[in-house]
A protein has these predicted regions:
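Juxtamembrane intracellular "pre-TM" segments in multi-pass secondary transporters
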Residues: 10-18, 199-230
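Helix-to-loop junctions at the C-terminal end of transmembrane segments
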Residues: 75-86, 276-288, 371-372
Length: 399
C-alpha cells in the first residue's frame, strides 16, 4: 500500500528526495487519471451526442464542456476554504459523489439536463483536483514537488487518451448509456484508491495562524508572477479545448470521414504527451520555468497549420504537437504556482484551477461560435491567439 502522506512536508525536508517516490508518483498519476477521466472522454462521442440531441456542434460542445464551469466554481470555493478542509476526506467524498451525476448522464432526457449534470461533474472533479494539488504542494519536498506535479498532470494526460478510447469503444459497441455507467464505476474506483493510499493529514496552514481566505486570495492576485501564471492557465485550456473539441467534427466530415471507433483511435495522439509531460518538472528545474513554457507553446503552435491540411496524417501530427505542447506548458505552470505561493498554497492552486477551467469554458463558447460561423480555419486562428497570449504572459514569470 502506497502511503502518500509519507512524502514529507516542504518545511521539514527542503532539499531531500522522498523515499519511494517512483511508486508514489505512479499512485499520484493514477489518482489524477481517475479524478478527471470524465472531463474529456465525452469529447470522443461528440458527433454521436450531437445527433442524439439534435443540436449544433457549438451547442453540444458547450454542453459537454460545461463541466469546466463547475470546475472553475469549485476550484475557487475549495481554494477559499482549503486551509480548513481535511485533504483525504475532501478528495474521497468528491470522487464518491462524482459517480452520481456521471451515472445520471445515461438517462439525461434533454440538453439542459445533460448540461446541468456536466456542471455537477465539474464541481466534484475540481474539488478532488484542487485538494490533491494543495496536498502535493504541502507534503512534497522542494526537490520532489516538480516530479509530483508532473506525475499528476501526466495522469491527466493519460485520462485524455484512455478515457476517449474507452468512451468511443463503449458507445460504439454498447451504446451511449453504458458509456456513462462505466465511467461512474471508474469514479468509485478512484475513491477506493484514495481510501487505501492517502492517510488523514491536517492542512499545513491550519497548523499556524493564517490570513483570512479573502486576504490570502487578494495577496495572491497582487503577486504579478502568480497573476501571470493564472492567465497562462486560462490561455492553455482555452487553446486545448478549442482544438480537441471541434477537431472531432472535422474528423468525421469529408474528406476525412472517420467512424466513431476510428475517431476514438485517433486519440492515440496523446500517447507522446504521456511520456513527455513526465519530464516537465525536470526540464523546468534545469532550464527555468519561462524557457520551458515558451518551448512548449512553440511546439503547440507548430501543430496548428498542420491541422488545416486535408490529409489525416498531417492532422494527426498537428494534434500530437498541440497535445505535447499544451500539457507540457500546463505541467510547468502548475508546478510554478505550487512553488511561487509562499503560503496558502491551497488557495493559490484553487485560483489557478479556476482560471484554467474558465479558459476552457470561454474557449468552448468563443471558438464554437467561430467554428459554426466561419469554419475550422477561424477556430484555429483563435487557438493561435490564445497560445500567443500565454507566451506574452510568460515574460512576467521569474527566470
Amino acid at each position: 500500500m502506497a502511503d502518500l502522506s509519507g512524502i514529507k512536508p516542504t518545511a521539514m525536508t527542503e532539499y531531500a528526495h522522498s523515499p519511494g517516490l517512483a511508486f508514489r508518483s505512479l499512485v499520484i498519476g493514477l489518482t489524477a487519471f481517475l479524478t478527471v477521466v470524465d472531463l474529456f472522454a465525452t469529447q470522443a462521442i461528440l458527433p454521436s451526442l450531437t445527433r442524439h440531441y439534435g443540436v449544433t456542434p457549438a451547442a453540444m460542445g458547450f454542453a459537454v464542456n460545461a463541466s469546466t464551469f463547475g470546475m472553475a466554481a469549485a476550484s475557487l470555493v475549495v481554494g477559499f476554504f482549503s486551509p480548513r478542509i481535511d485533504r483525504r476526506t475532501g478528495i474521497l467524498l468528491s470522487l464518491a459523489l462524482l459517480a452520481v451525476p456521471t451515472s445520471l448522464l445515461a438517462v439525461a432526457p434533454n440538453l439542459a439536463v445533460f448540461t446541468a449534470l456536466r456542471v455537477a461533474q465539474g464541481l466534484c472533479m475540481a474539488s478532488a483536483f484542487a485538494l490533491t494539488l494543495a496536498y502535493l504542494g504541502e507534503q512534497c519536498s522542494a526537490m520532489d514537488a516538480g516530479g509530483a506535479f508532473a506525475a499528476y498532470i501526466t495522469g491527466n494526460v493519460a485520462s485524455n487518451l484512455v478515457g476517449r478510447l474507452i468512451s468511443a469503444a463503449l458507445a460504439d459497441g454498447l451504446g451511449l448509456a453504458w458509456n456513462f455507467y462505466f465511467f461512474a464505476a471508474l469514479n468509485l474506483a478512484g475513491a477506493a484508491l484514495v481510501y487505501f493510499t492517502v492517510d488523514r493529514v491536517r492542512p499545513m496552514h491550519a497548523m499556524m495562524p493564517a490570513a483570512s481566505p479573502l486576504a490570502a486570495t487578494l495577496a495572491h492576485w497582487r503577486n504579478p508572477q502568480l497573476r501571470a501564471a493564472f492567465g497562462i492557465g486560462f490561455c492553455i485550456l482555452f487553446a486545448f479545448i478549442g482544438t480537441f473539441t471541434y477537431v472531432n467534427f472535422v474528423l468525421v466530415r469529408p474528406p476525412l470521414s472517420l467512424g466513431m471507433m476510428d475517431l476514438g483511435l485517433v486519440y492515440f495522439v496523446f500517447l507522446p504527451s504521456v511520456v513527455t509531460t513526465l519530464l516537465a518538472g525536470k526540464v523546468a528545474a534545469r532550464l527555468g520555468t519561462r524557457p520551458t513554457i515558451w518551448g512548449a507553446l512553440t511546439v503547440a503552435g507548430l501543430g496548428l497549420p498542420l491541422m488545416l491540411a486535408p490529409r489525416l496524417r498531417e492532422v494527426l501530427a498537428g494534434m500530437v504537437l498541440v497535445g505535447v505542447g499544451t500539457f507540457f506548458a500546463q505541467a510547468a505552470a502548475t508546478g510554478f504556482v505550487g512553488q511561487a505561493a509562499a503560503d496558502n498554497r491551497g488557495i493559490a492552486s484553487g485560483i489557478y484551477l479556476a482560471c484554467y477551467f474558465c479558459g476552457g469554458l470561454v474557449g468552448t463558447a468563443v471558438l464554437g461560435r467561430l467554428f459554426d460561423a466561419f469554419g475550422w480555419q477561424a477556430c484555429i486562428f483563435g487557438v493561435g491567439a490564445a497560445l500567443a497570449a500565454a507566451a506574452l504572459l510568460t515574460f512576467a514569470l521569474k527566470r
